[in-house]
């Protein structure tokens, strides 16, 4: 059993409140909690609520200078996970005042910043968040959204088609642009920089931007269709990233790209604001997501990262394929695809949706099916993802 040191109070005395009625303005979280042997589930759930809000390991005199009742997170419900021994879903409600407006960064620092290394827990996973309109309304959200993108591209009633230029590393800028032209001329709507194409010695970013823009304009002139190439603006500093975005705008291209997890939410939100102000679409790649979301018992489920991206801002986001080389369960994938596209998503535990989510008027994000898919997957992909999606081959 875990020994708690002298002077340490049980969290559940303050932070486990099963009678609490959640407020419409609360941010609600569902955690999958695996306590250490001997730690009661109520204590583990309360520990999560405390450590991700106002609590520390003991009582301090400054607690008397504020109203903990107003500011504390509360574990308001705990249920055992069916088929798992000693594993629980702990529901935590956070008062809205704990969070800075319009900052996904602050939201994550608060909710998942400290608790995951907690001694009383063997493992912890954030399964879902309910973002109230009172909070989501403080975010710009996607620069444009699904409908505006279709209007910009003049493409309706079908999924958009794209492919990633390969070999992803090693081509010169001119040969890279040549491949972009061939793909776009052949009928694709989009081509894509690979997520690790930034500005390497064999192909500096400005040269790539120039030759890709040339390829886009040539293909547009010959096909009479609007074409795009996701120019990856991800860089080592956010200033450099903005410089690359500005260059793309000057070239008049329709869309740029960002790796939002490696680049970070602060940089991503800045870029999304720039994209709205300057009429650029923003394609989001989720490089590094599996580090965070792949373990069943620990980390953060991708549906939370997807919701966070919709708030931070992006017009496309990679969302798994269900059919390709990388794993993804169909119902769960469709659950977060709906969370990306729709205004109102009902709670549905069979699809992994723990809370009803109301986005009110925040624009939607197009899910991108990408990773090991080829033409024989088309029937399955269109059935799974429907019209509002990007099918990204190669």
From Swiss-Prot:
The keyword Cell membrane does not apply. This is Ribulose bisphosphate carboxylase large chain. The modification N6-carboxylysine is found at residue 192. Its EC number is 4.1.1.39. Keywords: Calvin cycle, Carbon dioxide fixation, Chloroplast, Lyase, Magnesium, Metal-binding, Methylation, Monooxygenase, Oxidoreductase, Photorespiration, Photosynthesis, Plastid. It is an enzyme of class 4 (lyase). GO terms for biological process: photorespiration; reductive pentose-phosphate cycle. NCBIfam families: PRK04208.1 (NF003252). Pfam families: RuBisCO_large (PF00016), RuBisCO_large_N (PF02788). The record marks 325 as: Transition state stabilizer.
């Amino acid at each position: 059993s875990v020994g708690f040191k002298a002077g340490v109070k049980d969290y559940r005395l303050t932070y486990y409140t099963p009678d609490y009625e959640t407020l419409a303005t609360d941010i609600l979280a569902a955690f999958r909690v695996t306590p250490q042997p001997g730690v009661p589930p109520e204590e583990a759930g309360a520990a999560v609520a405390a450590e991700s809000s106002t609590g520390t390991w003991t009582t301090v005199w400054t607690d008397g200078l504020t109203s903990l009742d107003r500011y504390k997170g509360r574990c308001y419900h705990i249920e055992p996970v069916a088929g798992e021994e000693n594993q629980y879903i702990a529901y935590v409600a956070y008062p809205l005042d704990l969070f800075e407006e319009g900052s996904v960064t602050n939201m994550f620092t608060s909710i998942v910043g400290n608790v995951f290394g907690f001694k009383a827990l063997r493992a912890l996973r954030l399964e879902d968040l309910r973002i109230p309109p009172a909070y989501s309304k403080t975010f710009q959200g996607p620069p444009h959204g699904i409908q505006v993108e279709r209007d910009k591209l003049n493409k309706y009633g079908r999924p958009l088609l794209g492919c990633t230029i390969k070999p992803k590393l090693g081509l010169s800028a001119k040969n890279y642009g040549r491949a972009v032209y061939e793909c776009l001329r052949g009928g694709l709507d989009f081509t894509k920089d690979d997520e690790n194409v930034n500005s390497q010695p064999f192909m500096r970013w400005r040269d790539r931007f120039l030759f890709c823009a040339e390829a886009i304009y040539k293909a547009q002139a010959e096909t009479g269709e609007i074409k795009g190439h996701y120019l990856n603006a991800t860089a080592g500093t956010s200033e450099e990233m903005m410089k690359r975005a500005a260059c793309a705008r000057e070239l008049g291209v329709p869309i740029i790209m960002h790796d939002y997890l490696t680049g970070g939410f602060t940089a991503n939100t800045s870029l999304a604001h720039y994209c709205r102000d300057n009429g650029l679409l923003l394609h989001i790649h989720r490089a590094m997501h599996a580090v965070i979301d792949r373990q069943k018992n620990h980390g953060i489920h991708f549906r939370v990262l997807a919701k966070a991206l919709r708030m931070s801002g992006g017009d496309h986001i990679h969302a798994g394929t269900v059919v390709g080389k990388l794993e993804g369960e169909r119902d769960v994938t469709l659950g977060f695809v709906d969370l990306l596209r729709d205004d109102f998503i009902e709670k549905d535990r069979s699809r992994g949706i723990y809370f009803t989510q109301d986005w009110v008027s925040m624009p939607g994000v197009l899910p991108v099916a990408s990773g090991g898919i080829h033409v024989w997957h088309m029937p399955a992909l269109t059935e799974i993802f429907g019209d509002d999606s990007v099918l990204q081959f190669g």
